Amino acid sequence: MVRVTPLWILMRWRSYVRILSEAIRAVIPEAEVYVVGGAANDRLTVKSDIDVLIVLPHKLGFSKTVDLHAEILEEAEKLKLPLYAPIELHIVSKEELKKYKQREKIIPINEI
C-alpha cells in the first residue's frame, strides 16, 4: 500500500491539472486554462497548492463565480480527481489575465 504524504501528493500535480483541465473544458469549453504560482515557477513545497487560472471572456459576478467553481470541482470529482488534491482555482476575465502576465509566470495548460 502506498503511503500518501504531502510530497507524494505534490509529485503528482501534473496529473491533477490534466484531470482538472478536462473538467473545466466540459463545464466551460471557451475557457483558457493556465498554471500559475509555485508550480509554474518550479518552486513547490510540501505546503504548496496548485494554482490554476481559468480565464473567461468577461468578468463574472461573485455568485456566478462560486457556482462555476463548484460545478468544475463536481465534474473533476466525476473524472476521479482525488479529494486530497491541493488545487486552488482562480476564475478571472481576459482583462485580469493581463495583470497576471505582468506580475508572474503563467504556463498554458497544454504545455504541462
Predicted feature residues:
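Structural signature of the urease/amidohydrolase superfamily beta/alpha-barrel
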Residues: 51-52
